[in-house]
Regions:
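Bacterial N-terminal signal peptides
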Residues: 9-21
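Aromatic- and Gly/Pro-enriched helix-to-coil junctions and flexible linker segments
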Residues: 23-133
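Positively charged n-region of N-terminal signal peptides that target proteins for export
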Residues: 1-5
Length: 133
């Protein structure tokens, strides 16, 4: 039953115009293969550079979905439609579904897709348990 909620969230977010949002450039070593992925060192910088401009209180993505990506705890609360991350299950996590474009829309909405290596880092972090490390 996650997909109907996800589709509702996607439709809500998809109706927004995010033309004014800016994306940060990739950190120089952002795509280096990591033996373990850290939230603080690897995931938080991706979210800050690509997602937080919309997914923070007052942002368009937050207003549409309730998803706050400004901190680990806020992110793990999920959206008003349900959880975004299922620790240990990246392919069942709505965050992965959205950044991979497997829903009706892809995140970041209205912008270039996250580079594959950054998507892989997020996938690996969730697979490793989505720890606040």
């Amino acid at each position: 039953m996650r997909m109907p909620k996800l589709m509702l969230a996607a439709c809500a977010v998809g109706s927004l115009s995010l033309a004014g949002a800016t994306l940060a450039p990739l950190p120089r070593a952002a795509c280096a293969q990591q033996p373990r992925v850290s939230y603080a060192e690897d995931i938080a910088p991706i979210l800050k550079g690509w997602c937080v401009s919309c997914h923070q209180p007052g942002g368009q993505g937050f207003e549409a979905s309730g998803l706050d990506l400004t901190s680990y705890d806020a992110m793990m609360k999920g959206t008003k439609f349900g959880p975004m991350i299922i620790a240990g299950q990246p392919d069942s996590s709505n965050l992965i579904v959205l950044i991979e474009g497997r829903a009706q829309l892809r995140m970041p909405y209205g912008h270039k897709a996250l580079p594959a290596c950054l998507r892989q880092n997020i996938w690996t972090w969730i697979f490793e348990g989505a720890k606040n490390n």
